[in-house]
């Protein structure tokens, strides 16, 4: 799996919003709460021109959105001719004052030149996920975990949660707990300052990024 922690803010303050984009190949995209419940996405024009100051946003279409502070999960699926469908599974930490969007972007021209692609790239818009954070996105960063899988090679992750991190110093501290199907648990802590002492559950670290893997009581990675 892959971990993406994206912090963003204006140095001078006065942040209006910060947007996180992710594009993936495929014909279908399913955006729900992390527990699988519906977010009740509704059609929207909110992304159009990004409030009249980013005109490239006008290329997005079929936009739907929901305002939610819940953790979410998005699955992008390539429907393969041999039915061994390939998926990219994304879990993202929720935050107050956040909106999530599903949308379509223009097709990906470069990939259309690759031979033996599983579907007609030029005829398929690009699946697009957007998360919009009102205000700063430094102390409320975009935190995502990505895992590819297929029908014949299912993913290893059974759940992703985002436990709170305690620290005696104010800062952008992130906790991630990744439970795998074979019993391994990976705990991750990230801080915007490697000098800050951070604690989450049984894990205490002083680092910008630290991972502790444990399988059935045995430490397997630090």
What is each of the regions a protein language model found here?
Residues 129-140, 146-222:
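Non-catalytic terminal regions with compositionally biased, polar/charged low complexity
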Residues 19-21, 87-94, 101-105, 183-195, ...:
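Short amphipathic beta-strand/extended segments with alternating polar/hydrophobic composition
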Residues 5-45:
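Acidic (Asp/Glu-rich), glycine- and aromatic
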Residues 9-16, 23-24, 121-125, 134-139, ...:
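A structural signal for short secondary-structure junctions
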Residues 5, 60-62, 75, 118, ...:
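Generic recognition of flexible, low-complexity loop/linker segments
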Residues 41-123:
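Trp/Gly-enriched beta-strand surface patches
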Residues 1-4, 8-13, 141-142, 146:
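C-terminal substrate/ligand-recognition segments
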């Amino acid at each position: 799996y892959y971990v993406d922690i994206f912090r963003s803010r204006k140095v001078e303050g006065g942040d209006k919003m910060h947007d996180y984009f992710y594009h993936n190949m495929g014909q279908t995209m399913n955006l729900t709460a992390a527990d699988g419940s519906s977010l009740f996405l509704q059609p929207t024009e909110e992304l159009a021109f990004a409030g009249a100051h980013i005109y490239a946003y006008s290329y997005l279409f079929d936009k739907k959105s929901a305002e939610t502070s819940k953790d979410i999960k998005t699955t992008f699926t390539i429907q393969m001719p041999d039915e061994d469908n390939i998926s990219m599974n994304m879990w993202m930490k929720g935050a107050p004052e956040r909106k999530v969007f599903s949308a379509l972007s223009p097709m990906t021209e470069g990939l259309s030149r690759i031979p033996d692609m599983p579907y007609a790239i030029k005829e398929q818009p690009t699946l697009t996920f957007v998360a919009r954070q009102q205000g700063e996105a430094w102390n409320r960063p975009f935190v995502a975990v990505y895992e590819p899988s297929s029908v014949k090679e299912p993913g290893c992750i059974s759940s992703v949660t985002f436990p709170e991190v305690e620290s005696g110093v104010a800062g952008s501290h992130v906790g991630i707990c990744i439970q795998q199907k074979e019993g391994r648990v990976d705990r991750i802590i990230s801080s915007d300052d490697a000098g800050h002492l951070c604690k989450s559950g049984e894990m205490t670290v002083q680092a910008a990024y630290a991972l502790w893997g444990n399988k059935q009581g045995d430490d397997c990675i630090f």
